[in-house]
Amino acid sequence: MEVLRTPDDRFVDLPGYDFAANYVDDLPDYEGLRVHYLDQGAKGANQTFLCLPGEPTWAYLYRRMIPVFSNSGARVVVPDWLGFGRSDKPVDDAVYTFDFHRNMMLAFIEHLDLRNITLVVQDWGGILGLTLPVDQPNRFSRLIVMNTAIPVGVSLGDGFRAWKEYVASRPNMDCGALMKRACPHLSDLEAQAYEAPFPDQRYKAGVRRFPQLVMVEPGMEGIETAKRARKFWQDEWEGESFMAIGAKDPVLGLTVMNQLRKTIRRCPEPIVLEEAGHFLQEWGEPIAQAALKQFGDLY
Protein backbone atom coordinates (compact mmCIF):
# COMPACT_ATOMS: atom_id res chain seq x y z
CA MET A 1 0.00 0.00 0.00
CA GLU A 2 1.42 3.36 -1.04
CA VAL A 3 1.02 5.88 1.77
CA LEU A 4 1.80 9.59 2.00
CA ARG A 5 2.64 11.47 5.18
CA THR A 6 2.06 15.22 5.23
CA PRO A 7 5.25 17.09 6.22
CA ASP A 8 5.16 18.63 9.69
CA ASP A 9 6.00 22.07 8.36
CA ARG A 10 2.53 22.26 6.82
CA PHE A 11 1.11 22.53 10.34
CA VAL A 12 3.33 25.28 11.77
CA ASP A 13 1.71 28.40 13.27
CA LEU A 14 -1.89 27.51 12.48
CA PRO A 15 -4.13 30.21 14.02
CA GLY A 16 -5.83 29.26 17.26
CA TYR A 17 -4.20 25.85 17.32
CA ASP A 18 -1.33 25.10 19.70
CA PHE A 19 -2.12 21.50 20.63
CA ALA A 20 0.59 18.84 20.76
CA ALA A 21 0.47 16.04 18.20
CA ASN A 22 0.23 12.41 19.32
CA TYR A 23 0.55 9.34 17.13
CA VAL A 24 -0.12 5.61 17.16
CA ASP A 25 1.15 3.34 14.37
CA ASP A 26 0.56 -0.16 15.73
CA LEU A 27 -3.21 -0.57 15.75
CA PRO A 28 -4.17 -4.20 14.99
CA ASP A 29 -4.62 -4.66 11.21
CA TYR A 30 -3.33 -1.11 10.65
CA GLU A 31 0.31 -1.63 11.60
CA GLY A 32 2.56 0.94 9.97
CA LEU A 33 -0.27 3.39 9.31
CA ARG A 34 0.24 6.37 11.58
CA VAL A 35 -2.90 7.82 13.15
CA HIS A 36 -2.72 11.33 14.60
CA TYR A 37 -4.71 12.46 17.60
CA LEU A 38 -4.91 15.26 20.13
CA ASP A 39 -4.97 14.30 23.80
CA GLN A 40 -5.77 17.24 26.06
CA GLY A 41 -6.58 17.41 29.75
CA ALA A 42 -5.86 14.83 32.43
CA LYS A 43 -5.50 11.26 31.18
CA GLY A 44 -6.92 10.02 34.46
CA ALA A 45 -10.04 12.19 34.22
CA ASN A 46 -13.42 10.63 34.89
CA GLN A 47 -14.89 11.93 31.63
CA THR A 48 -13.39 11.57 28.15
CA PHE A 49 -14.68 13.60 25.23
CA LEU A 50 -14.02 11.74 21.97
CA CYS A 51 -14.44 14.30 19.18
CA LEU A 52 -14.71 12.96 15.63
CA PRO A 53 -14.36 15.27 12.60
CA GLY A 54 -15.82 14.62 9.16
CA GLU A 55 -15.32 15.46 5.49
CA PRO A 56 -12.93 17.11 4.59
CA THR A 57 -11.78 18.33 8.00
CA TRP A 58 -9.45 17.27 10.78
CA ALA A 59 -8.75 17.91 14.47
CA TYR A 60 -8.36 21.64 13.76
CA LEU A 61 -12.16 21.79 13.51
CA TYR A 62 -12.50 21.22 17.27
CA ARG A 63 -10.05 23.91 18.40
CA ARG A 64 -12.87 26.13 19.76
CA MET A 65 -14.48 23.32 21.77
CA ILE A 66 -11.41 21.55 23.18
CA PRO A 67 -10.58 24.21 25.83
CA VAL A 68 -14.18 24.28 27.07
CA PHE A 69 -14.22 20.52 27.54
CA SER A 70 -10.73 20.29 29.07
CA ASN A 71 -11.39 23.21 31.44
CA SER A 72 -14.25 21.19 32.91
CA GLY A 73 -11.67 18.68 34.16
CA ALA A 74 -12.22 16.17 31.37
CA ARG A 75 -9.85 14.45 28.98
CA VAL A 76 -10.35 15.40 25.32
CA VAL A 77 -9.24 13.08 22.51
CA VAL A 78 -9.54 14.15 18.87
CA PRO A 79 -8.27 11.66 16.25
CA ASP A 80 -7.86 12.28 12.54
CA TRP A 81 -9.28 9.67 10.20
CA LEU A 82 -6.74 8.00 7.94
CA GLY A 83 -6.55 10.15 4.82
CA PHE A 84 -7.15 13.36 6.75
CA GLY A 85 -5.33 15.86 8.94
CA ARG A 86 -1.99 14.65 10.25
CA SER A 87 -2.84 10.97 9.87
CA ASP A 88 -1.25 8.94 7.07
CA LYS A 89 -2.90 9.03 3.66
CA PRO A 90 -3.14 5.89 1.50
CA VAL A 91 -2.90 6.99 -2.13
CA ASP A 92 -5.33 4.51 -3.68
CA ASP A 93 -8.92 5.78 -3.49
CA ALA A 94 -10.18 2.19 -3.25
CA VAL A 95 -8.49 1.68 0.14
CA TYR A 96 -11.09 3.91 1.75
CA THR A 97 -14.23 2.02 2.73
CA PHE A 98 -16.78 2.31 5.51
CA ASP A 99 -15.31 -0.66 7.35
CA PHE A 100 -11.71 0.53 6.83
CA HIS A 101 -12.49 3.71 8.75
CA ARG A 102 -14.83 2.19 11.31
CA ASN A 103 -12.57 -0.69 12.30
CA MET A 104 -9.65 1.72 12.69
CA MET A 105 -11.62 3.83 15.15
CA LEU A 106 -12.78 0.81 17.13
CA ALA A 107 -9.14 -0.31 17.39
CA PHE A 108 -8.06 3.22 18.36
CA ILE A 109 -10.57 3.35 21.23
CA GLU A 110 -9.42 -0.05 22.45
CA HIS A 111 -5.76 0.94 22.16
CA LEU A 112 -6.22 4.03 24.35
CA ASP A 113 -8.71 2.13 26.53
CA LEU A 114 -11.07 5.09 26.48
CA ARG A 115 -13.94 4.82 28.97
CA ASN A 116 -16.88 6.92 30.12
CA ILE A 117 -16.83 8.52 26.68
CA THR A 118 -18.85 11.53 25.68
CA LEU A 119 -19.08 10.97 21.93
CA VAL A 120 -18.93 14.25 19.98
CA VAL A 121 -19.83 13.91 16.31
CA GLN A 122 -20.67 15.79 13.13
CA ASP A 123 -20.81 14.80 9.43
CA TRP A 124 -18.81 11.58 8.83
CA GLY A 125 -17.83 11.74 12.48
CA GLY A 126 -21.45 10.78 13.09
CA ILE A 127 -22.06 8.53 10.08
CA LEU A 128 -19.23 6.36 11.40
CA GLY A 129 -19.13 7.42 15.04
CA LEU A 130 -22.78 6.74 15.81
CA THR A 131 -22.19 3.09 14.91
CA LEU A 132 -19.30 2.60 17.37
CA PRO A 133 -21.30 2.10 20.61
CA VAL A 134 -23.06 -0.87 19.02
CA ASP A 135 -19.83 -2.85 19.48
CA GLN A 136 -18.49 -1.02 22.55
CA PRO A 137 -21.63 -0.06 24.51
CA ASN A 138 -19.97 -0.04 27.93
CA ARG A 139 -17.43 2.59 26.87
CA PHE A 140 -19.95 5.32 26.01
CA SER A 141 -22.03 7.34 28.46
CA ARG A 142 -23.03 10.59 26.70
CA LEU A 143 -23.56 12.03 23.23
CA ILE A 144 -23.12 15.46 21.64
CA VAL A 145 -24.46 15.26 18.09
CA MET A 146 -24.33 17.95 15.39
CA ASN A 147 -25.39 17.98 11.71
CA THR A 148 -25.05 14.34 10.75
CA ALA A 149 -27.15 11.29 9.93
CA ILE A 150 -27.32 7.50 10.14
CA PRO A 151 -27.95 6.62 6.47
CA VAL A 152 -29.50 3.21 5.77
CA GLY A 153 -29.71 3.11 1.97
CA VAL A 154 -32.18 5.94 1.40
CA SER A 155 -31.48 9.20 -0.44
CA LEU A 156 -30.51 12.25 1.62
CA GLY A 157 -32.06 14.49 -1.03
CA ASP A 158 -30.95 16.83 -3.78
CA GLY A 159 -28.52 18.73 -1.57
CA PHE A 160 -26.40 15.68 -0.92
CA ARG A 161 -26.63 14.57 -4.55
CA ALA A 162 -25.27 17.96 -5.62
CA TRP A 163 -22.47 17.77 -3.04
CA LYS A 164 -21.46 14.30 -4.20
CA GLU A 165 -21.32 15.45 -7.82
CA TYR A 166 -19.41 18.58 -6.81
CA VAL A 167 -16.63 16.60 -5.12
CA ALA A 168 -16.52 13.99 -7.90
CA SER A 169 -15.91 16.73 -10.46
CA ARG A 170 -13.06 18.24 -8.40
CA PRO A 171 -10.41 15.61 -7.62
CA ASN A 172 -8.20 18.37 -6.19
CA MET A 173 -10.94 20.26 -4.34
CA ASP A 174 -9.62 23.25 -2.39
CA CYS A 175 -10.69 22.41 1.16
CA GLY A 176 -9.72 25.84 2.44
CA ALA A 177 -11.90 27.61 -0.10
CA LEU A 178 -14.76 25.26 0.74
CA MET A 179 -14.49 26.07 4.45
CA LYS A 180 -14.34 29.81 3.76
CA ARG A 181 -17.60 29.61 1.81
CA ALA A 182 -19.26 27.46 4.46
CA CYS A 183 -17.97 29.55 7.39
CA PRO A 184 -17.62 33.15 6.19
CA HIS A 185 -16.46 34.33 9.60
CA LEU A 186 -13.19 32.39 9.25
CA SER A 187 -10.04 34.37 8.54
CA ASP A 188 -8.14 33.44 5.41
CA LEU A 189 -5.45 31.79 7.54
CA GLU A 190 -8.01 29.74 9.46
CA ALA A 191 -9.59 28.56 6.21
CA GLN A 192 -6.18 27.67 4.78
CA ALA A 193 -5.56 25.40 7.79
CA TYR A 194 -8.06 23.00 6.25
CA GLU A 195 -5.96 22.72 3.09
CA ALA A 196 -2.74 22.26 5.10
CA PRO A 197 -2.96 18.43 5.23
CA PHE A 198 -2.96 18.18 1.43
CA PRO A 199 0.20 19.39 -0.36
CA ASP A 200 -1.19 18.14 -3.67
CA GLN A 201 -3.94 16.04 -5.24
CA ARG A 202 -2.30 12.71 -4.37
CA TYR A 203 -3.03 13.34 -0.70
CA LYS A 204 -6.77 13.77 -1.26
CA ALA A 205 -7.96 10.21 -1.87
CA GLY A 206 -9.90 10.24 1.39
CA VAL A 207 -11.51 13.57 0.53
CA ARG A 208 -12.62 12.22 -2.84
CA ARG A 209 -13.96 8.99 -1.40
CA PHE A 210 -16.01 9.99 1.65
CA PRO A 211 -18.99 11.36 -0.37
CA GLN A 212 -19.03 8.18 -2.45
CA LEU A 213 -19.31 6.03 0.69
CA VAL A 214 -22.41 7.63 2.23
CA MET A 215 -25.03 4.87 2.33
CA VAL A 216 -27.76 6.41 0.18
CA GLU A 217 -28.47 3.41 -2.06
CA PRO A 218 -29.52 -0.15 -1.17
CA GLY A 219 -26.76 -2.71 -0.76
CA MET A 220 -23.96 -0.31 0.15
CA GLU A 221 -21.32 -1.28 2.69
CA GLY A 222 -22.25 -0.05 6.14
CA ILE A 223 -26.04 -0.23 5.81
CA GLU A 224 -26.46 -3.26 8.05
CA THR A 225 -24.16 -1.70 10.65
CA ALA A 226 -26.14 1.53 10.44
CA LYS A 227 -29.41 -0.33 10.94
CA ARG A 228 -27.96 -1.92 14.07
CA ALA A 229 -26.91 1.55 15.21
CA ARG A 230 -30.38 2.99 14.72
CA LYS A 231 -31.84 0.19 16.80
CA PHE A 232 -29.22 0.78 19.50
CA TRP A 233 -29.92 4.50 19.79
CA GLN A 234 -33.68 4.02 19.70
CA ASP A 235 -34.05 1.06 22.02
CA GLU A 236 -30.87 0.48 24.02
CA TRP A 237 -29.15 3.82 24.65
CA GLU A 238 -29.14 4.63 28.36
CA GLY A 239 -26.93 7.72 28.31
CA GLU A 240 -27.51 11.46 28.12
CA SER A 241 -27.72 13.26 24.79
CA PHE A 242 -27.28 16.82 23.56
CA MET A 243 -28.11 17.97 20.03
CA ALA A 244 -27.11 21.17 18.24
CA ILE A 245 -28.11 22.08 14.69
CA GLY A 246 -26.62 24.54 12.23
CA ALA A 247 -29.75 25.77 10.47
CA LYS A 248 -27.98 26.91 7.29
CA ASP A 249 -26.75 23.41 6.42
CA PRO A 250 -28.28 22.61 2.98
CA VAL A 251 -27.76 18.85 3.35
CA LEU A 252 -27.84 17.76 7.01
CA GLY A 253 -29.86 20.61 8.44
CA LEU A 254 -33.07 20.89 10.43
CA THR A 255 -35.13 18.27 8.58
CA VAL A 256 -32.50 15.54 8.73
CA MET A 257 -31.52 16.35 12.30
CA ASN A 258 -35.09 16.34 13.58
CA GLN A 259 -35.49 12.91 12.02
CA LEU A 260 -32.30 11.80 13.75
CA ARG A 261 -33.55 13.15 17.06
CA LYS A 262 -36.52 10.79 16.86
CA THR A 263 -34.02 7.93 16.56
CA ILE A 264 -32.12 8.82 19.75
CA ARG A 265 -33.83 7.69 22.91
CA ARG A 266 -34.74 10.56 25.25
CA CYS A 267 -32.89 13.13 23.14
CA PRO A 268 -34.01 16.57 24.39
CA GLU A 269 -34.94 19.57 22.28
CA PRO A 270 -31.96 20.66 20.17
CA ILE A 271 -30.19 23.98 20.28
CA VAL A 272 -30.54 25.61 16.86
CA LEU A 273 -27.96 28.14 15.65
CA GLU A 274 -29.71 30.08 12.90
CA GLU A 275 -26.48 31.69 11.68
CA ALA A 276 -24.44 28.47 11.58
CA GLY A 277 -24.00 26.00 8.76
CA HIS A 278 -22.79 22.45 8.34
CA PHE A 279 -19.45 22.82 10.16
CA LEU A 280 -21.05 23.68 13.47
CA GLN A 281 -17.81 23.32 15.43
CA GLU A 282 -16.69 26.63 13.93
CA TRP A 283 -19.37 28.14 16.19
CA GLY A 284 -18.36 25.62 18.83
CA GLU A 285 -17.53 27.43 22.06
CA PRO A 286 -21.12 28.30 23.08
CA ILE A 287 -22.27 24.86 21.93
CA ALA A 288 -19.71 23.16 24.16
CA GLN A 289 -20.70 25.40 27.07
CA ALA A 290 -24.39 24.63 26.56
CA ALA A 291 -23.69 20.89 26.46
CA LEU A 292 -21.74 21.02 29.72
CA LYS A 293 -24.51 23.04 31.33
CA GLN A 294 -27.11 20.50 30.27
CA PHE A 295 -24.96 17.62 31.53
CA GLY A 296 -24.38 19.41 34.83
CA ASP A 297 -20.59 19.49 34.44
CA LEU A 298 -18.67 22.20 36.21
CA TYR A 299 -17.77 25.08 33.94
Annotate each PLM feature.
Residues 99-117:
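Conserved acidic catalytic loop of the alpha/beta-hydrolase fold
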Residues 30-40:
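A short loop-to-beta-strand scaffold at the N-terminal edge of the catalytic core in hydrolase folds
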Residues 266-299:
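Catalytic active-site module of serine/aspartate enzymes centered on a nucleophile-bearing elbow/loop
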Residues 24, 204-262:
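Conserved serine/cysteine hydrolase catalytic core
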Residues 38-88, 280:
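Conserved HGGG/HGGXW glycine-rich cap/lid loop of the alpha/beta-hydrolase fold
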